[in-house]
Amino acid sequence: MIELKKVYKEYVNDKVVTKVLFDINLKINKGEYIAIMGPSGSGKSTLMHILGLLDTPTKGEYFFNNKKVGKMEDEELSEYRNKKIGFVFQNFNLLPKTSVWDNVYLPLFYSKDKVNIKDVDKSIEEVGLKHRRDYLSNQLSGGEKQRVAIARSLVNNPDIIFADEPTGNLDSKTGLQIVSILKKLNDHGKTIILVTHEKITAEYANRIISMNDGKITKDTEEFKTRKVDKNTQLK
């Protein structure tokens, strides 16, 4: 599904070069639940931005569904981002004073294809917010806002969900509710790529990629995956 070969990333600002990623080699298969883990400044968010087609490598090759990303035109890249990828971020990125329903509908508003309005209600129900569909975003708790963000990422039925520190602004119990939603989506076939600095959050994944100083230091599949407590699951 995804393959990176000898990927490097650096930024140049006022002739100052900052090297962020070094010699990244990575394969991600369809249906995996992966946690990318590391301290602040380790390069994990930059790696996610490259994987999610929000940024490009300085050097190296990136293949998405066997297509070389570096040779894609801007229109094709945009289509991949809109149809095959869903994003969830730490700060929710919701429109203020706008209803849950309208926030979730937003990606469909920009779609060039024929849309099915029922997909909005389906996505809202999938994250347990059917009873909040008409609430404004500023009337919601932090956990509810993150659920809206997940519903919005689902509305185009993407193959992959990228979640960058989705529990970072939440208390531990609410964070585990978000983890339970991501786990449920993975159980239903979605590929989940989660960026986190929290070990307990990473342990709900099936594979943990550890990073430090821009390098992958460990890629672990042989561990006991933490189970979601039924008391934290959405009803």
Q: What is each stretch, according to the model?
A:
Residues 2-24, 28-205:
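ABC family nucleotide-binding domain
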Residues 28, 212-213:
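A short hydrophobic/aromatic micro-motif that marks alpha-helical segments and, especially, helix-coil
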Residues 42-44, 212, 235:
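Serine/proline-rich low-complexity intrinsically disordered segments, especially terminal tails, linkers
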Residues 73, 212, 220:
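Residues at the C-termini of beta-strands that transition into short coil/loop
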Residues 208-210:
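Conserved short hydrophobic beta-strand within the ABC ATPase nucleotide-binding domain
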Residues 215-235:
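Conserved beta-strand-loop-alpha-helix hinge in the C-terminal portion
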